[in-house]
């Protein structure tokens, strides 16, 4: 979904509005038209709703079955043939007529003439006649004339004959044709997420490809003169660009296709240059440059283009969250602090990516847990602590990962959940019930 704004970039597919403002002189300290007066501060729920209102599922595309895991079906799938396509044996054993072995017992076995063998993937060499049998393998087609299989451990071969030691009923150890699916049966409805198990069913139903909702192409931009790549030596005031790599991984984990725009310096023109390929993307995710500092150019540039929806959320960590558009492409600007970036991704970017893929389960299920640490919160904010949850008998207990500073990335790496403290709550005492968002399985 694209927005109408005054934004235009050289080389983009959109043309400049005749009323667009002239570009301002390039300056590292230029902050565009940011109004430093109080701006509306949205709740987390309001901000997420505003973002999702601007996001729509992508168009459908054909996807080879082997590449469809995790994708969302754009249309229902029906079986093109019966599954299984023929009645087959569920056991290694002997194909028999049940009536021929009705009197069999260990003390008085029934003797049947052995006509041959049926292997999986081959046609039976003969039909089963009265008082005869065929050796049969698991998955092999049931020979004509037979209606049951005696397990190999319940019989013995001697001198070209088979001794059957137990009776069996008609249908024993068989998989009937069409018992899994009949031709025309619904295999999966539109909107279903494709799992490995479903891929197997789709393959058995005759499908080699499926129509899936598209995967969103996400342009990722990190900003800041201080950023250096992992492994590079750090000079005074410089830090490693962790956000770039955590975002790339998080976007791919959520089903997005990354367009890596690299690192923009704190210069207006470099920021513009990095956004030239925005027309190739369906979402832009940036980090840094969204607050009120003199070098926070991202928000200033977007304000100048009248492309900002909101830029403050009553959230800790991550209050300066920007939602805007670049040449009509939605942009979510996350703060530069590493933990703020990841919390913002979880609360806002991940739901947007899932919606673009046709998912309806946009938020992770929440659980109630008992906190083992006191939690202190500014009551005007909704705070998300990083926690480690574990199952303790019939309840879930949770404790903090340690230092909760928004710069302490390890607090997020060690966490398997987020602990939610809502607005209006100042303190949560040890032993109190809290809401948590599991990020990984809780043992």
What residues fall within each predicted segment?
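Flexible glycine/proline-rich
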Residues: 61-66, 70, 74-75, 121, ...
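Short, conserved secondary-structure segments in the cores of folded domains
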Residues: 73, 85-86, 114, 124, ...
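Short, low-complexity N-terminal leaders and the immediately following helix N-cap/first helix
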Residues: 28-108, 112, 359-384
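Helix-rich terminal scaffold detector
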Residues: 2-4, 24, 28, 32-45, ...
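Short, glycine/charged-enriched hinge/interface segments at domain edges or termini
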Residues: 33, 42-45, 94-260, 397-398, ...
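Generic low-complexity, intrinsically disordered segments
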Residues: 1-3, 8-13, 18, 30-32
């Amino acid at each position: 979904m694209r927005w109408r704004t005054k934004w235009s970039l050289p080389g983009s597919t959109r043309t400049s509005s005749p009323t667009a403002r002239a570009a301002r002189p390039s300056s590292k300290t230029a902050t565009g038209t940011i109004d430093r007066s109080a701006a509306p501060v949205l709740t987390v729920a309001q901000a997420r709703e505003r973002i999702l209102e601007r996001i729509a599922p992508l168009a459908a595309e054909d996807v080879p079955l082997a590449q469809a895991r995790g994708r969302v079906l754009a249309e229902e799938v029906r079986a093109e043939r019966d599954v299984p396509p023929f009645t087959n044996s569920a056991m290694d054993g002997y194909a028999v007529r049940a009536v021929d072995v009705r009197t069999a017992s260990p003390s008085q076995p029934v003797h049947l003439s052995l006509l041959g063998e049926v292997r999986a993937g081959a046609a039976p060499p003969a039909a089963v006649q009265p008082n005869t049998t065929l050796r049969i393998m698991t998955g092999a087609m049931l020979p004509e004339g037979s209606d049951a299989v005696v397990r190999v451990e319940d019989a013995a071969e001697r001198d070209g004959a088979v001794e059957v030691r137990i009776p069996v009923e008609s249908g024993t150890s068989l998989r009937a044709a069409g018992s899994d699916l009949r031709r025309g049966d619904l295999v999966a409805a539109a909107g279903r997420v494709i799992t490995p198990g479903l891929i197997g069913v789709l393959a058995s139903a005759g499908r080699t490809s499926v129509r899936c909702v598209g995967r969103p192409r996400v342009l990722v931009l990190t900003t800041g003169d201080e950023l250096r790549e992992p492994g590079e030596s750090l000079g005074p005031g410089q830090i490693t660009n962790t956000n770039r790599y955590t975002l790339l991984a998080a976007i791919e984990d959520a089903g997005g296709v990354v367009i890596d725009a690299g690192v923009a310096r704190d210069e207006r023109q470099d920021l513009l240059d990095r956004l030239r390929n925005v027309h190739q993307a369906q979402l832009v995710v940036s980090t840094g440059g969204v607050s009120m500092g003199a070098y926070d150019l991202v928000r200033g540039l977007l304000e100048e283009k009248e492309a900002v929806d909101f830029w403050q959320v009553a959230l800790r960590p991550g209050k300066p969250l920007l939602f805007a558009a670049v040449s009509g492409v939605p942009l979510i600007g996350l703060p530069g602090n590493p933990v703020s970036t990841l919390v913002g991704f979880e609360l806002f970017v991940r739901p947007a990516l899932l919606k673009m893929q046709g998912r309806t389960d946009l938020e992770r299920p929440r659980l109630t847990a008992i906190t083992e640490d006191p939690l202190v919160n500014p009551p005007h904010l909704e705070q998300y602590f990083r926690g480690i949850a574990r199952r303790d008998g019939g309840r879930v207990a949770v404790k903090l990962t340690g230092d909760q500073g928004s710069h302490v990335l390890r607090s997020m790496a060690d966490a398997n959940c987020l602990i939610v403290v809502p607005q209006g709550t100042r303190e949560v005492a040890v032993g109190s019930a809290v809401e948590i968002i599991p990020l990984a399985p809780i043992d």
